[in-house]
């Protein structure tokens, strides 16, 4: 039963995953010590080229407020959808067992995007590639609006997973490229707080829409329109980011 599943999972985390993480971190730390001289010079040189923005400076940057709607979209919409997935399945006449049993497709999508989007960012930079990260979510929402066949649940979950993988990989790189590495911890802590708040607001907002008799398909198309608008905003915000960052670093 579910108790056995939770128990086995906790045991696996205790005796398998946590020791593996500690071993990998120790190995990484030893590797950094072995190459401390060369690594330090490279990091110090690259940091000195680009001035790092403080959190306060970021909050005074107009680009941040154009990027923010796209940043909160995965947390707000994703949490809302997962919270109401049984309602979604009922609205689409999908078996709840079939739908929830297909979550592995979501995991495959998330893992695939996490592993592939990083190299894309390395080649293209986050400023050029991140504006596309909401495209899978837009397609997933359109699927819910347009199709009823249960097989479309796999495409929907796969696209949601792709969006999540691209989000976690891309946004961290984006903040480093836009605002530098020195104050990245302070900047990330603010972003995480905002996205957590968005996650908390998503389910009740979607629940209110359901209670006001807005169909699941129409809710998803509303979310899709929001994501399209957020994508336009982030394109505008990042279009001149290279020159803006250079101007700031030179001042």
Predicted stretch roles:
Residues 128-142:
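Structural signature of the two symmetry-related core transmembrane helices
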Residues 181-213:
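A late C-terminal transmembrane helix in Major Facilitator Superfamily
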Residues 113-125, 210-211:
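Helix-to-loop junctions at the C-terminal end of transmembrane segments
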Residues 1-29:
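Helix-loop-helix hairpin linking two adjacent transmembrane segments in secondary transporters
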Residues 166-179:
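Intracellular juxtamembrane helix-capping segments at the cytosolic ends
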Residues 151-159:
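Paired small-residue
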Residues 1-11, 208-226:
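A membrane-interface helix-boundary motif in multi-pass transporters
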Residues 56-114:
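Extracytoplasmic gate region of multi-pass secondary transporters
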């Amino acid at each position: 039963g579910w108790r056995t599943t939770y128990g086995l999972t906790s045991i696996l985390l205790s005796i398998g995953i946590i020791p593996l993480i500690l071993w990998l971190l120790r190995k990484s730390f030893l590797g950094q010590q072995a190459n401390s001289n060369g690594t330090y010079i490279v990091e110090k040189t690259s940091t000195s080229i680009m001035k790092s923005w403080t959190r306060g400076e970021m909050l005074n940057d107009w680009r941040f407020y154009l990027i923010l709607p796209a940043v909160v979209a995965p947390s707000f919409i994703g949490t809302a959808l997962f919270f109401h997935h049984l309602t979604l399945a009922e609205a689409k006449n999908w078996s709840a067992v079939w739908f929830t049993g297909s979550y592995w497709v979501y995991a495959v999508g998330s893992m695939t995007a996490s592993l592939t989007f990083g190299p894309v960012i390395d080649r293209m930079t986050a400023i050029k590639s991140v504006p596309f990260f909401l495209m899978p979510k837009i397609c997933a929402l359109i699927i819910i609006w347009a199709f009823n066949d249960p097989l479309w649940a796999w495409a929907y979950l796969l696209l949601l997973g792709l969006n999540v993988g691209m989000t976690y990989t891309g946004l961290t790189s984006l903040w480093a490229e836009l605002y530098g590495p020195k104050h990245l911890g302070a900047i990330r802590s603010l972003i995480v707080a905002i996205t957590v708040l968005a996650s908390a607001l998503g389910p009740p907002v979607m629940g209110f829409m359901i209670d006001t008799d807005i169909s699941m398909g129409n809710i998803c198309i509303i979310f899709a329109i929001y994501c399209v608008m957020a994508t336009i905003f982030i394109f505008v915000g990042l279009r001149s980011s290279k020159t803006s960052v250079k101007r700031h670093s030179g001042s």
